[in-house]
From Swiss-Prot:
It is found in: Plastid, Chloroplast thylakoid membrane. GO terms for cellular component: chloroplast thylakoid membrane; plasma membrane; proton-transporting ATP synthase complex. The gene is atpI. The lineage of its organism: Eukaryota, Viridiplantae, Streptophyta, Embryophyta, Tracheophyta. Belongs to the ATPase A chain family. The chain crosses the membrane at residues 38-58, 95-115, 134-154, 199-219, 220-240. This is ATP synthase subunit a, chloroplastic. InterPro entries: ATP_syn_F0_a_bact/chloroplast (IPR045082), ATP_synth_F0_asu (IPR000568), ATP_synth_F0_asu_AS (IPR023011), F0_ATP_A_sf (IPR035908). Disulfide bonds: none annotated. GO terms for molecular function: proton-transporting ATP synthase activity, rotational mechanism. Its main location: plastid. Keywords: ATP synthesis, CF(0), Chloroplast, Hydrogen ion transport, Ion transport, Membrane, Plastid, Thylakoid, Transmembrane, Transmembrane helix, Transport. It holds the Pfam family ATP-synt_A.
Amino acid sequence: MNVLPCSINTLKGLYDLSGVEVGQHFYWQIGGFQVHAQVLITSWVVIAILLGSATIAVRNPQTIPTKSQNFFEYVLEFIRDLSKTQIGEDYGPWVPFIGTMFLFIFVSNWSGALLPRKIVQLPHGELAAPTNDINTTVALALPTSVAYFYAGLTKKGLGYFGKYIQPTPILLPINILEDFTKPLSLSFRLFGNILADELVVVVLVSLVPLVVPIPVMFLGLFTSGIQALIFATLAAAYIGESMEGHH
């Protein structure tokens, strides 16, 4: 007799839970749209850091490289090796894409831990890593999905779609679903890990003295770098898979 009221209360509870936000957020009202200002501000800082670093890297190259030039060359070589390992011999055109993804995510993740959050006073909330917002991670995953299809169609033409009926046509729905779940897994993995890391640090800082959370902060820096590497590696692997065939 009480099943219906309980079901209604459960649905109401789930609806209320769906409106919960983690922390306070500051929005800009532009026309009829709400823009997440915290994400934009930190993203602009990250982009400025990357553009400034790229300008320094190519401004005055030396025959005998300096320490900074050695560092940038090492980063480029690392990205090239990563792309070649996952994509294969046709990795060249994809190095800029994989490199952009890796560097933006890496610097974004670290910005949440290293940039002083009080450096910019906001009416609500504080600055945080762009990647702790689901909109950012989805925006990074969708171009990866587009690149995945583009690489396969460029290499194989319409024959690319034949992979969906391999090894048997019965697997057609599963193979189609697999392609749509790849960007979801990329975005939610990155979002969940970065958000959880920042929440743990915030809670520890509020509960205990500053010295105690420092090891956790260093662990967060390490895991942030690992998350950037995982995202870039999976993106390159998906592109390589679409060019080589179904696995």
